[in-house]
Amino acid sequence: MSFVTVKGLNIHYEKSGRKGKKVLLLHGWGQNTEMMAYIADFLKKHFIVYNLDFPGFGESEEPKEAWSNEDYVDFLHEFVEINKINNPILIGHSFGCRVALYYAYKYPVYKMALTGAAGIIAPHDLEWYLKVYTYKAGKILLKPFKNLSKKLQSNAGSEDYKNASPVLKGTLVKCVNFDITPYLKDIKPETLLIYGDKDEATPIWMGKKMEELMPNATLITFEGDDHFAYIHQPDRFNRVLEAYLKSDYD
């Protein structure tokens, strides 16, 4: 467990691997490093992996005021500079993809793999976003993640949105009202988009639109799965990553 000060906040992250290109794992809303830990374990043989808690989540300090999507991008850039990372590979889920996409618009990125990517505005209210972006009742995860599911239940789900701090509620309002669509045509890194075709939080039409507008994006679907397909099918997800990143192995 490591901590570093970024934008004046105490930030938790886990670093693994000793050689290779550098990968940043960016979790979804209401989640933390644990959600991406199995990906880090898989990739650390060939990459240097940074798995971080966004400000306001996990073990990282909460911002003093509501942040926008751009604030999170600025945070990520400062983290990258502190750790002397050049042209990172970004792997994200949901909210993490929202940050990754705008980061790739503003700063150099080598490649991205984005699952359940958020960023295109959908006609929903705040309460809906808070419900679908966090785990409800712990019934989403399959057996390999039962222990993780219990941990998440204590901090997420139907009660979490009611008890979320004013800062995080304000943050979510700002972030979900930021539309990445006008920037997609200028996001040039090779990007793999992975969506469950039953995703209700970020419906597959969003992935199709991103694939259409981004010059180097490819969309694949996990049939019959939802917004958390990467957790429901971890082995399949890692095999997809392996095929996508194998040419970059150290």
Mark where each language-model region is:
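Conserved alpha/beta-hydrolase catalytic His-Asp/Glu region
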Residues: D125-P189
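Active-site loop/oxyanion-hole signature of alpha/beta-hydrolase fold enzymes
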Residues: E14, N51-I91, R239
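Alpha/beta-hydrolase fold catalytic core
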Residues: M1-V23, K44-F47, I85-N86, Y110, ...
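Short alpha-helix in the alpha/beta-hydrolase fold that links the catalytic acid
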Residues: P189, P203-M210
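Short beta-strand/loop motif that positions the catalytic acidic residue
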Residues: I187, L193-Y195, D199
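Catalytic histidine-centered segment of alpha/beta-hydrolase-like enzymes
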Residues: D225-P234, N238
